[in-house]
Amino acid sequence: DIANAVWQIAEGLGDTSHWDFTRLMAIREANEAQIAEGADDDRFPVYPQRLVADIRRVLPSEGIVALDNGIYKIWFARNYKAHKPNTVLLDNALATMGAGLPSAMAAHLVYPDRPVISVCGDGGFMMNCGDGGFG
């Protein structure tokens, strides 16, 4: 159980009040600033950071994003701020193309009152579009 493992690690660390996170916080702030730069970029075709920011703006905190595989998954993994646990679905280990749409469909079945969006490319969509009557 991860909670137990984290608890044991924390117990083993002892006093951490002397730790200095100044440099780490500066790196985080620089990263946040870089992400914010692209959030309102109006270039065409759409800038990936803009797409991620727009989806974050319109999707409520309990909304679910199901990602297929493609370079956009990296943009979401780096730039999308999940406000609640289990609201970003991605298959990181095997990079399974075509998983985004069925993941979104399953999420909607499990959480019918929450908005769900699938982000997938043409190939991933075509692999499963018949499952939802889209084909």
Question: Language model features by range: what are they?
Answer:
Residues 110-135:
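Conserved thiamine diphosphate
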Residues 26-113:
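Active-site diphosphate/adenylate-binding microenvironment
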Residues 18-22, 66, 115-118:
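Acidic/polar loop patches that form or flank catalytic/metal-binding clefts of enzymes
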Residues 10, 101, 105, 117-119, ...:
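Hydrophobic, well-ordered secondary-structure segments
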Residues 1-25:
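Glycine-rich, acidic loop regions that bind phosphate or pyrophosphate groups
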Residues 13, 82-83, 135:
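Short secondary-structure boundary/capping segments
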Residues 5-6, 73-75, 97, 125-127:
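Flexible loop/turn segments at secondary-structure boundaries
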